């Protein structure tokens, strides 16, 4: 119910309408499993309000922002916008948060002869909010070594040329950031 209230509150904040409805939801996703279940649920609630009360006028980016605000302020999850935006767009995308560019990614696994399988490992992301919330600060910390505010402004070659203590969490996170971006064309 916190996410539903949060979505309604965020919609109120942007001047969008909302109201009551009856719904039943079933899911086989475990809460805290790392599959963006809270982002997907918040996006779903926003889309329902958007369709019922706003003639579907909110664009996917606005829907994602509403969902993010609901998670941040009402669900206690200090998340970014990536999961909500991917859920709102409904497809695999490359998102450059520095430029705002969003590029669809061809994820037709069957055409490539692959099958995407999800496995329940029994792990949980529940309780990781404090560590997760430190990610933006860690990224800015590394960026500050190069006189930049955001890690996306740093040249990866400059980052890799510097001698780092690779056991430091901010360094590992920055390396992951650059490695992930290098994987996407």
Language-model features: locations:
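Gly/Ser-rich oxyanion-binding loop with an adjacent helix/lid
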Residues: 1-109
